[in-house]
Regions:
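Active-site bordering "gate/hinge" segments
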Residues: 1-174
């Protein structure tokens, strides 16, 4: 914010205000790209929650342009978001164990997270940036066999998460 003051003695007679932000980094890059290319750019904001950024970006653009996406695309977006969310929470849980020096718990949680990373890679072809969202819907479908694979992996992850939660709830080191 910049102020240009006109003063007489100690009395301010006029103030000219220039406000605004200096766009740097990704903001500046976004001004040079089109809406579609910005979808990819938004995924690069953070690798742990990359899908969240492209999800909300696409929703914002769709709302502004009055685009209604198909119901199946909404489900597929949520599916990708949930897979990514579970992996992200497991990573953060592992980091908490690492910070307090509980190395075996850190390794265990990272092994469980690895199962979710495998799901991301198998379903979306990538372990970090899923690149599943696009303006108007999603880039890929999830067929029945892939859904069965996801459900099978969740069946393995869920008891492991229960075990991890039990450790966090009861172990005096945590």
């Amino acid at each position: 914010v910049y102020f240009r003051l006109t003063v007489e003695g100690e009395t301010v007679r006029n103030v000219e205000l220039t406000s605004g932000h200096v766009h740097r980094g990704m903001e500046a890059m976004a001004t040079q790209r089109n809406l579609i290319k910005n979808t990819t750019l938004t995924e690069r904001v953070c690798s742990l929650c990359s899908n969240s950024h492209s999800f909300t970006y696409c929703m914002s653009v769709e709302n502004v342009l009055g685009i209604t996406i198909p119901e199946r695309a909404r489900y597929l977006r949520v599916l990708a978001e949930e897979i990514k969310r579970v992996a992200s929470h497991l990573f953060n849980t592992a980091i908490q164990a690492h910070i307090i020096g509980f190395k075996s718990l850190f390794m265990h949680v990272m092994e469980v997270r690895e199962m979710m990373q495998d799901v991301k890679e198998t379903v979306y072809g990538n372990r970090m940036n899923l690149a599943s969202n696009c303006i108007g819907g999603v880039k890929c479908d999830v067929e029945r066999d892939m859904l069965d694979y996801i459900l099978g992996m969740i069946a393995k992850v869920e008891p492991a998460v229960d075990e991890i939660r039990e450790i966090y709830d009861t172990n005096s080191l945590v």
